[in-house]
C-alpha cells in the first residue's frame, strides 16, 4: 500500500504536468501550519527559477489544474507561491479502510530482505546488570523489532564481555578461597564436575573483591595475569571454570533481560572470536596492512578527508596480547563466516565512536567485509539523574538494573492503588507492565544519541508524553470496545466513514501516517520517531473521544463507523508499542 504523501504527490504531479511544468516540483509534505492546511507543496518556489516566472503564477496554474480532483477537498495558492491542500474526507476514509483490511496496515514488506545483525547488550559476565546497560538493551531491542517488522532477517547478539583479565581475577580469587578444587590440579585428567563451585551471588561478590585486591597487591595482579594467560592458552581446569562462570552468569542475565522484555538470538561473547584472531592477524601481515610501531602491531586507518586525528588501529600489544579492537575485528570475521550479514549495527555508548571508526575502517581496508557490507554505529547518550550527572544510587554507587525496575514498579503500584480499587495480585501485574512502559518509553522517546534525565516521577505519570499515558489511551479504547460488545453489537462490522468533525478527521490523518513513520523509523534506526508519532496519535484520539459521544449516540451508522475507527487506532497503537518493546494491560 502506497504512503499517503506519495499518493498526494502523484496527484499534484499530474497538475504540474497539465499546467506545463516539470513533475519533479510536485513533492507534497505535511503542513508546517496545520491551522491553515493539512498538506503543502512548495514546488512553485523552486520552479520559478527554472521557468523565470513569479512563483504565485505557477502556483495558481497548478491549483487551476487541480480543480475537480477527487483526492483533495480544498486547494489554495498562497503568496508568495505555496500550494495549501486539505485531503478529501471520503478519500481519506477509503485509505483507512484499505489499511484496516491489510494485515500490515499499509506497511510494505521489504522486497529484497537483508540479513541484519545487531550487536547490543554487551554485559560483562560475573557482574550484575546495572543502569549503564539499560540503553543498549532497550534501543537495540526496539531497532531489532522494527527491522523484523520491515521484513528483514534480524539476528540479535548480546556480545558478552567474557574474556581478558576479569576471568583471571575470578580464577585467582577462587583459588585463594577454595584451593582444594579439582580445577586447580594440573595433573587431573578426569571429567570436571557438572555443577559450578559457586552461585551467582558468590560470583558477583568474588569479582569486585579480586579487582580491589589487584589494585593493592602487585603479586596478586601478576597471579591474575598469569591465570588469564593460562586460560587463554588452553589450560583444561581454567577452561572448565570459564564454562561454569558463563553458565551461571548467562542464566542470571537471561532472567534480568527477560524482566526488561529483551531477548537475544545469540549469546556469544568475546571468547567465541578468539580462535579467529591468529589467522586474521597473519592475513593482515601478509597483505601488507599490519606493521610494527613502538613494538605493537598496528594498521593505519587515517583518511585524507579526516577533520580530526584518527590513530592507527592497534591489533596486538608489545607483549603479543590482543585488545578490544582485535576481538571486535575477529568477531566481524566470525559473523561474516557464520551468518554473512548485509549489515551489522552496533548499539553502544557514543563515547566509543573513535574505537568503531578504527574498527570499521580496518575491517574494510583489510577485506574482512565485502564492499556491500554496511557497518553502522548507533551511539547512545548517557542516562542522567535529576542533577544532570550519570544516574547513581543515593550513596553514589552504580545502581543495579533490577533495583531500578523494582523502584519503578513500586512507584507505579502506589499510583495504581491510589487511582482505583484493584486486587493486590492484579495491581502488581499491572504495575509491572506499566512500569516497563515508563522505563522504555522514557528512554526511547529521546533521540538515541542525546543524553536524557531519568525522572521516575515524570516517567510514571499517566499524563504528558509518557509510556503510561500511551497505555492509558489504549486501555480507554479497549474499555469502549468492551462496552460496545457487551451491549450486544459486534465491533468491526461497519466501515470507517468520512470524518464528521475536525477532531475525527485529525485522528484519521494521524492514522494515515503510520506506514510512513514505520519506514522512517527503520531507515534511520530511530525508535524515537515512533514515540513522537504515538504521542500525537494518542492526543488526537483523546481529543476525538472527549468531543464525541461514541456510545451514547442514537446515530447507529456513525457509531459503527467510529467503532471501526477505534479498532484501527488500537491496532496501530499496539503495533507501535510492540516495536518499542512493551504491551498494554487490560485495565489500569
Where are these regions (language model features)?
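Short, charged, solvent-exposed linker or helix-capping segments at domain edges/interfaces
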Residues: 94-99
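Non-catalytic interaction-recognition regions
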Residues: 1-93, 110-588
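Short, charged beta->alpha transition segments
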Residues: 101-110
